[in-house]
């Protein structure tokens, strides 16, 4: 391999690294919908094990953290899939005070679905 071939390989490798870093920043794709008393949050996280995903709600901020290990025996030619997801999302709802826990969370086929109870306020009795 000559100098031009080596330089081309290094440039493509650097582009791949920057692309992966970009995807780690913008991913994962997220959908949210209001369903009665719950906010349903759907997050695409293929390639991550359920045990490696950490979720936390603090106020109306949902934090998603995931990390996966990859073992490669050969030479990496192209590498774009993210190893790490560290995302904070502002939820469009008020979460019930003291119930910052997710109502339910399911992870199946690389898709994480959260059901988060919403706050309705308190009825006021008139005397």
Residue spans for each PLM region:
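Alpha-crystallin/small heat shock protein
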Residues: 1-127
